[in-house]
């Protein structure tokens, strides 16, 4: 065996040792009920096979036919074992769908059933120390939940919203991501400094969280389009907020924030897309809504790898937990708007960022809406500005609220200063 081959084999042995060390982890056990799967990992000429069954991880015979084959290209192992691993190397799903030097083969539904276990396994094997950040003062008791009725084009819709902060101050409205709800912004809604400066809003969109389907719903598959989504947002801004607001949506919420800025700028005084996509293709898969897959396990795991490995584990768990509770088909249908319909190349030039201030926030560990995507959007909106967050992922407000707070403060200060020349940091 050559020196190079020996080095690869040694690195693979380190990775496999870490994966085996996760055997018996209580969370892994919770995420793998009924699972029995063989995983093969190849790098160069080295190969290892692991048997994963209901929380147990054991070596399997090298000659076994694996259910899932994972092939790591040159240099991938070294990056995976860095502390912290760089973007696109931080977890199983990041490696599978975002890393061009990795291939994963296996039955699609079998892979979907194993995703929760595999994501947790690789999360533990590639763990990094938590990144410290100044603690923010929060008062969750200051957040008030309300039930309201929106008069929308499709008829009246009862929704749940949360409101906090200084009544009558500049409105700051947070919009949640696909398949989730306003719990993602719990830390920002309770933030004392934000509440002193802004009137804070965080609604659950219809069919999400505590916003129930209308009684007139016939049970047909839920669908989301730009027109329907914008109608909901416009109704909330006009009927609940009642004056121009700063709109701060994340992911699909960022996409509709840009749509609103393009088509209804009179309702806004500032545009703050968090993790905005350019064209986020390939986000839909069968495991999100198939009777052969536990969608709660799958969908929570599918988003887990989008976060930074240095974000606090407890917050990352909460972010995934929200996704585990979505109604059947809602996440996948939301992605129909986010991943199939929304086109930043079409929408961004319609936003007049020279008159309406626009600041984009992009996390480096986000492979669904990357910093490069944000830069493309900025280039199409002269006057827009972008802040890159090198140590955060797709759910910055949820995965590490204290670290995100500084970036949010910076973005809000730029919005308050008015439109500006393009700048990227």
What residue spans do the PLM features occupy?
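Alpha/beta-hydrolase fold catalytic core
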Residues: 113-116, 122-172, 195-198, 243, ...
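Catalytic active-site module of serine/aspartate enzymes centered on a nucleophile-bearing elbow/loop
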Residues: 384-425
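Flexible "cap/lid" loop of the alpha/beta hydrolase fold
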Residues: 258, 262-298
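Conserved serine/cysteine hydrolase catalytic core
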Residues: 336-379, 388
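Active-site loop/oxyanion-hole signature of alpha/beta-hydrolase fold enzymes
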Residues: 199-248, 406
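Conserved HGGG/HGGXW glycine-rich cap/lid loop of the alpha/beta-hydrolase fold
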Residues: 157-215
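Feature captures hydrophobic
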Residues: 1-145
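Conserved alpha/beta-hydrolase catalytic His-Asp/Glu region
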Residues: 282, 296-353
